[in-house]
């Protein structure tokens, strides 16, 4: 199925690219999320008329993500407290939601879906490096200091 991308999609293309994808991927993911439209003659003409607007919107989203990444770089370290045993292991864990809440409290709005925990939830006290995926082209890193209560 031929589609026109309205947004940058990882491993597929950027705004305005006309790509061939499997019909299920287009119908179940790209089109419902507003990332693509079917490549009909009418949609191609409509897209060409709106190309400048969509590219400006994509550039604005990239600039906003870069500004948020700069704020996260300024913060550098975020502390999260949790109950822990004597050996430094937590009773429970620190999830992406907890880290997103801590970053939001520090002044940068971050959704839990943007926090990338490579090895799963944090289960020990100490400092942990966590990646924040703000945009397909913008990633930031923050150090999470887990402190025992």
From Swiss-Prot:
Keyword rRNA-binding: yes
One Gene Ontology term of the molecular function aspect: rRNA binding
Entry keyword Repeat: no
Residues of the signal peptide: none
Any one annotated GO CC term: ribonucleoprotein complex
Transmembrane domains' residue ranges: none
Keyword list, A-Z: Ribonucleoprotein, Ribosomal protein, RNA-binding, rRNA-binding
GO BP term, pick one: translation
InterPro entries: Ribosomal_bL9 (IPR000244), Ribosomal_bL9/RNase_H1_N (IPR009027), Ribosomal_bL9_bac/chp (IPR020594), Ribosomal_bL9_C (IPR020069), Ribosomal_bL9_C_sf (IPR036791), Ribosomal_bL9_N (IPR020070), Ribosomal_bL9_N_sf (IPR036935)
Protein purpose: Binds to the 23S rRNA.
Family statement drawn from the similarity comment of this UniProt entry: Belongs to the bacterial ribosomal protein bL9 family.
HAMAP family with a match to the protein in the record: Ribosomal_bL9
Name of the protein described by the UniProt record: Large ribosomal subunit protein bL9
Encoding gene, per UniProt annotation: rplI
């Amino acid at each position: 199925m031929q589609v026109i991308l309205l947004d940058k999609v990882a491993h597929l293309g950027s705004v305005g690219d006309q790509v061939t994808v499997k019909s299920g991927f287009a119908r179940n993911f790209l089109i419902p999320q507003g990332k693509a439209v079917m490549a009909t003659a009418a949609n191609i003409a409509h897209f060409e008329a709106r190309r400048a607007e969509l590219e400006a919107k994509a550039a604005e989203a990239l600039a906003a993500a870069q500004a948020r990444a700069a704020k996260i770089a300024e913060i550098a370290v975020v502390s999260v407290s949790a109950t822990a045993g004597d050996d430094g292991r937590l009773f429970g864990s620190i999830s992406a939601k907890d880290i997103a809440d801590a970053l939001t409290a520090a002044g940068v709005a971050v959704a839990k879906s943007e926090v990338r925990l490579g090895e799963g939830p944090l289960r020990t006290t100490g400092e942990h490096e966590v990646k924040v995926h703000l945009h397909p082209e913008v990633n930031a890193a923050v150090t999470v200091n887990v402190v025992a209560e």
